[in-house]
């Protein structure tokens, strides 16, 4: 449980690192739709820590000009957490200095499925025709509709898999994997990732320029 506690507290440090380095958007994968399969006591502990985090951090985030967003199926969370999320998002909605997305009860497949269902309803009602559906329109139905696609995905813990995270959005995202686990991840590792990323050539399906 200590790892979970430190991991949640680590969020504040990484937000500050991003701010110091001029990065304006950060998304952290906190709890997946599949994490409900974990032992009930562990899930309860995690949810209590998320709730405590919201109580402790949101006012300070607002003072720093941070816009807080939660992406995921919020309706499955407890009424108490949902209430705190609504307050936090409402309080910080106008902030533009930094955007922090917390992926909570999130799944990339679930996000795409939700988008497809919403589009299907629009077509069924006659408000949208199939011919209008393209990549640009589809993006508008994602949880991250108002945000650019990620430039860099950092995977801690040495795992070489995406774990159902932002499946649509990371089509051309660069990956950086570190054996360091999230509770121990800090500014040093973040800078290593950025330095590696800075030397890459992003081709978006094109060819390398010599």
Provide a role label for each language-model segment:
Residues 1-210:
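Flexible, compositionally biased loop and terminal segments
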């Amino acid at each position: 449980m200590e790892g979970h506690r430190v991991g949640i507290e680590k969020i504040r440090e990484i937000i500050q690192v991003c701010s110091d380095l001029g990065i304006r958007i950060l998304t952290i994968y906190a709890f997946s739709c599949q994490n409900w399969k974990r032992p009930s006591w562990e899930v309860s502990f995690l949810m209590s820590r998320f709730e405590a985090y919201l109580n402790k951090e949101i006012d300070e985030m607002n003072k720093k000009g941070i816009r807080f967003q939660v992406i995921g199926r919020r309706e499955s969370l407890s009424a108490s957490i949902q209430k705190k999320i609504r307050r936090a998002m409402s309080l910080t909605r106008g902030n533009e200095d930094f955007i922090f997305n917390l992926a909570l009860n999130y799944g990339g497949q679930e996000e795409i499925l939700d988008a497809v269902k919403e589009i299907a309803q629009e077509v069924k009602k006659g408000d949208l025709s199939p011919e209008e559906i393209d990549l640009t329109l589809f993006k508008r139905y994602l949880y991250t509709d108002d945000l650019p696609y990620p430039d860099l995905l950092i995977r801690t813990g040495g795992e070489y898999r995406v774990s159902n995270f932002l499946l649509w959005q990371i089509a051309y995202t660069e990956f950086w994997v570190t054996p360091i686990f999230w509770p121990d991840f800090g500014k040093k590792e973040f800078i290593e990732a950025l330095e590696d990323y800075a030397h890459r050539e992003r081709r978006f399906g094109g060819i390398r320029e010599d």
